[in-house]
Structure formats: C-alpha cells, structure tokens
From Swiss-Prot:
It comes from Mus musculus. GO terms for biological process: adult locomotory behavior; ameloblast differentiation; epidermis development; ganglion mother cell fate determination; innervation; long-term memory; mechanoreceptor differentiation; negative regulation of programmed cell death. Residues 22-79 form a propeptide. This is Neurotrophin-4. Pfam families: NGF. The lineage of its organism: Eukaryota, Metazoa, Chordata, Craniata, Vertebrata. Disulfide bonds join C96-C169, C140-C198, C157-C200. PANTHER family: NERVE GROWTH FACTOR NGF -RELATED (PTHR11589), NEUROTROPHIN-4 (PTHR11589:SF8).
Length: 209
C-alpha cells in the first residue's frame, strides 16, 4: 500500500501532457584541427572548390591595379608587378622583376620550426564537398632564353652601380596558415613559408654593406 503523497505524485506524472522531444541536429562544428582560425588566414591563401579566377583584392590594391577600366584583362594571375602598374607609371622599372600566380599543386612546405610538412590537397568542409588549398605566390621572374640582363631571379638588380655593389634578385618568403600533416601523420593548421616577393640584396664590394 503506497502512501497518499506517492499516489498523488504518480497521478500528477500520468496527467502531464506528453511533450514531443525534438532530436538535436548534429553539430556542424568541424573537429578542432579542421576549423581554421579565419582571422589568421592570409589573403594569399584561398579555400575553395575551384581555382580562383584572379589575384586577391588586396594584391590588386597594393599593385595599384584597382579601378582599371572594365575592358582591362580580368585574369592577371600570371602577370608580373610591372604589367599590373597603372598607365601613369608605365615608365618606371622595378629593381627586380616578379611574377605572381596561384599555386595549385603545392605538396610540401617548411613550417615555423624549420621542418618539412605535407600540405594537404583537400580541406574537409561541413555539409559539402571538400575544399582545396590555393596559394598566391610571388617569385622572381626566371631568365628567359636569350633574354639575359639585370632584374631576373639569380641575376643582378636593375639600376645598381656595379662598381661598388654586388647585387642579386632573390625570393622573399612569408608565413601563412595551411592545413598540413607532419612526419608522424598529425594533421593541423600550421604556419608554412611561401614566396611572397622578389627583393634586391646588396653586398658592398669593399666588404662593408
């Protein structure tokens, strides 16, 4: 024989309206190693399902190509800095010639600790097909056959007095975030080095820079 208060509690629970429990939708949050810190991604890195059609907007602004007429070529991903300069600066020459473009087949890179890591070709995305990693790199223009002279990669810088200075055009690297795997198979977002400029290095012929 149950006490009276126990019977009242059972009757109360029985009379409660049944409230349908909605199933919780599965979390769309990616695992920690797959969720990039978006504020740390460089404009030189693109995560997309197809290769970008042109350079990053920030690159166009820095190169002075923003605001060109509508008839200007849209695809400048393989053009050098001198080719994207506005008409008012056509007479100027760069100390070192550079070419920029999207790298679509990068497989390895050097991370912040100087170790070689594998750059993953695909980045899993929630609710869709995976994304690919593209890197907009700037390198020194290679010397073409029969087109020797200053301003190309490995050559002397343009406009430098060779009587007093030894000069060379070299690629400059910067760090960007990318999804990589180390030698032990650990996957994560790491800082890797990519080519971002072509600069002139000088060495005094007297041994003092």
């Amino acid at each position: 024989m149950l006490p009276r208060h126990s019977c009242s509690l059972l009757l109360f629970l029985f009379l409660l309206p049944s409230v349908p429990m909605e199933p919780h939708p599965p979390s769309s949050t990616l695992p920690p190693f797959l969720a990039p810190e978006w504020d740390l991604l460089s404009p030189r890195v693109a995560l997309s399902r197809g290769a970008p059609a042109g350079p990053p907007l920030l690159f166009l602004l820095e190169a002075g190509a923003y605001g060109e007429p509508a008839g200007a070529p849209a695809n400048r991903s393989r053009r050098g800095v001198s080719e994207t300069a506005p008409a008012s600066r056509r007479g100027e020459l760069a100390v070192c010639d550079a070419v920029s473009g999207w790298v679509t087949d990068r497989r390895t890179a050097v991370d912040l600790r100087g170790r070689e890591v594998e750059v993953l070709g695909e980045v899993p995305a929630a609710g869709g097909s995976p994304l690919r990693q593209y890197f907009f790199e700037t390198r020194c223009k290679a010397e073409s056959a029969g087109e020797g002279g200053p301003g190309v990669g490995g050559g002397g810088c343009r406009g430098v007095d060779r009587r007093h200075w030894l000069s060379e055009c070299k690629a400059k690297q910067s760090y960007v975030r990318a999804l990589t795997a180390d030698s032990q198979g650990r996957v994560g977002w790491r800082w890797i080095r990519i080519d971002t400029a072509c600069v002139c290095t000088l060495l005094s012929r007297t041994g003092r820079a």
